[in-house]
Amino acid sequence: MRHVLIVGINKVSIKYVCDAIRSAGFEPILSVDPSGFHGAAKAVFEGVTCIPAFTDTDALSGYLKANEALVGKIHSITTFFDELFPVVSAIAQKFGFNAPPAVFARLSSKEFVGGLIPEHVPAESCVALADGDFVLPWLTPGVKNDVVLKPAVGSGAVATTMLSIAADVDPASVIKSAILESGIDDPEGIAWIVQAHCVGDLVSMEGFVQDGRVVFLGLSRRDRVGFTEVANQFPANQLIDQSVRSKIETAVRDLVSRSAFDNGFFHCEFIATPSTAYLIDANMGRLGGASIVEQIALAYDLPPATVLQHVALLPLGLLDATLEYKPVEECRQTLSYWYCLDHEAIVHDWEVPQMASIHTPIANVGSVIQPIGTSDYAWIGMLTGYAEVVVREIGQVLVHTDRGPRRPVFK
């Protein structure tokens, strides 16, 4: 049997990925650490070949070289994390695996995307400390400028921060200090995006391109506390003005056309204002993370594994048939709370009664979890379902921590 190696998958999608791959006649190999999963979720790994979790090309290459028998089984390699497409592309080329198109790897760079569609992104510059001095010509002189600083390749708001640059200080010095204090490995060795801060609603266009046809599944609208996304509504088309939705669709179509992107999903993030929208992250080649797969499945009356099979196999050219989606206007409203705690804590367990909504533990038991507002790594768990049901049931979830039992925090 042909095997598909999956490098990078979240704790929601992993519940369905084995069924998704096997029902198409393939066998999954998961590059994942099962110890990070809670309770019943570990049953997913029974009878499945797992290898260590890799995010580095050299490390994964070394592992595969040392396991020739495993390499002989692998037909294809893919990922559900857009920042890992460069790793997947390099490994596929080195070992001769089938893989998503190479443009997926190039599109993981925010700098590359901004260069393709500059009219659709906020004013921005790509900087690297290794390159020496830099200037930001688009800053407004003589006033305070608010900017967002983030790695050029990355997701989940890791190492993302908002900076207020006073009128009387050197912008480059402020940005250099923030990069050095970011807390990530080798901040001097990577590229960073400095982007004008935009105020508005955080929305994402979910959809895919198949054989040159762009399909928009609908808008997600997310609530944030600081840099943590805490709730997601899907579909949320009715919450955004038609003219702004058209601007969003134009931006996606322009990016697809100019990059020659095809046969893959997208999760394009925008800041939407009452009159326009700015693309802030393209996320090309993958479905939205967190609970998006469950929300699309619920909205469109499809099994999550069916949606995930479409996501995984479309870029690999392994689909037997086209999956048809009903009009978004016929979809039922879904809601997911990506809940947190309001203080740093160690999570011990969850207490969740029988309910209609779908609950997914996210935090690693025994690990210190940061409070809401820091990044998406503050997530404790997710509760997903039809909107009116989730609102009613979220209060039934209880999280046991080193500081006692706590209720979910999501606002």
Residue ranges: model-predicted function:
Residues 1-103, 386-389, 393-410:
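ATP-binding N-terminal substructure of ATP-dependent carboxylate-amine bond-forming enzymes
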Residues 93-164, 180-181:
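A conserved helix-loop-beta module that forms one wall/lid of the active-site cleft
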Residues 137-138, 309-411:
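Peripheral (often C-terminal) accessory segments that flank ATP-dependent C-N-forming ligase machineries
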Residues 224-233, 289-297:
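A short, polar/charged loop-to-alpha-helix boundary motif
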Residues 247-268, 283-343:
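Active-site "cap" helix and flanking loop/linker of ATP-utilizing ligase/carboxylase catalytic domains
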